[in-house]
């Protein structure tokens, strides 16, 4: 959008990517909790995406020249580091991620597959909009691997039309609909890579085999189902962050 459709920038979500959200919180909230200067914290992200290296280096994601994310490596690089260090994962004990930034929900897990971001958003948006508990957590109609697909979600009597695309060629088609005033959608999810982040350029090579992407997506949905918390707004640490740091009167508006 920045390069080819700059006139549509105001239509984009104002939320940063998960990588940049984490970096900013780690070097503000977490640094304050530890009582250390942000420059003494090094944030390393492990990502499925090659473009995250560039994203982490963008000057708008830095404070006084100190980046929110210092180093971004992709999945295959991590695998090489593990092999280089002769780490045998089968021999490692299970452990939880560090808190407070290690707690996650099923909604966060499905971000990795096409349709997952908008499904996670719908789980929260439904409850915030209707003030009712979501009767069915899984939005099956948003799932699949078709390059372009659409669905209408019932928000307690209000139909919300969703468009989904993965792959840049498919994304362009939906964006051109918006540009031409022909888009029927209230919200659109776009992922650059086939299948979403599961097919990212930094992931183990799938070599265009859709069955590999299906299995990766199925694994994410299984992980989502196994979670106790499956909606983003149910995460107690996210709630605490909004209460003490992120919530403002502007956000309420």
Describe each model-derived feature in a short phrase:
Residues 19-196, 207:
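Catalytic cores of enzyme domains
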Residues 5:
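Conserved phosphotransfer cores of two-component systems
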Residues 247-252:
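Conserved small/polar residues in nucleotide/adenosyl-binding loops
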Residues 13-16, 26, 202:
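Active-site adenylate/phosphate-handling loop in enzymes that bind or generate adenylated species
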Residues 162-190, 203-243:
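Ferredoxin-type iron-sulfur electron-transfer modules in oxidoreductases and energy-metabolism complexes
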Residues 199:
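Short, non-ligating residues that shape and space the ligands of small metal-coordination modules
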């Amino acid at each position: 959008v920045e390069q080819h459709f700059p006139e549509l920038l105001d239509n984009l979500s104002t939320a940063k990517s998960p990588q940049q959200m984490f970096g900013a919180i780690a070097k503000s909230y977490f640094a304050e909790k530890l009582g250390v200067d942000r420059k003494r914290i090094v944030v390393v992200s492990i990502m499925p995406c090659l473009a995250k290296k560039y994203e982490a280096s963008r000057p708008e994601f830095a404070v006084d020249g100190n980046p929110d994310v210092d180093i971004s490596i992709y999945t295959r690089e991590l695998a090489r580091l593990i092999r280089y260090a002769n780490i045998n994962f089968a021999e490692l004990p299970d452990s939880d991620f560090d808190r407070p930034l290690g707690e996650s929900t099923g909604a966060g897990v499905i971000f990795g597959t096409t349709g997952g971001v908008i499904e996670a958003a719908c789980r929260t948006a439904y409850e915030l909009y209707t003030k009712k508990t979501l009767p069915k957590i899984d939005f099956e109609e948003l799932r699949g691997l078709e390059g372009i697909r659409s669905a209408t979600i019932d928000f307690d009597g209000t139909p919300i039309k969703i468009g989904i695309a993965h792959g840049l060629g498919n994304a362009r088609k939906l964006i051109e609909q918006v540009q031409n005033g022909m888009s029927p959608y209230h919200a659109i999810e776009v992922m650059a890579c086939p299948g979403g982040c599961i097919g990212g350029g930094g992931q183990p090579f799938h070599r265009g085999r859709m069955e590999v992407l299906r299995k990766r997506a199925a694994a994410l949905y299984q992980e989502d189902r196994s979670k106790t918390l499956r909606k983003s707004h149910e995460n107690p640490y996210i709630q605490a962050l909004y209460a003490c740091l992120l919530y403002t009167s502007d956000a309420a508006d």
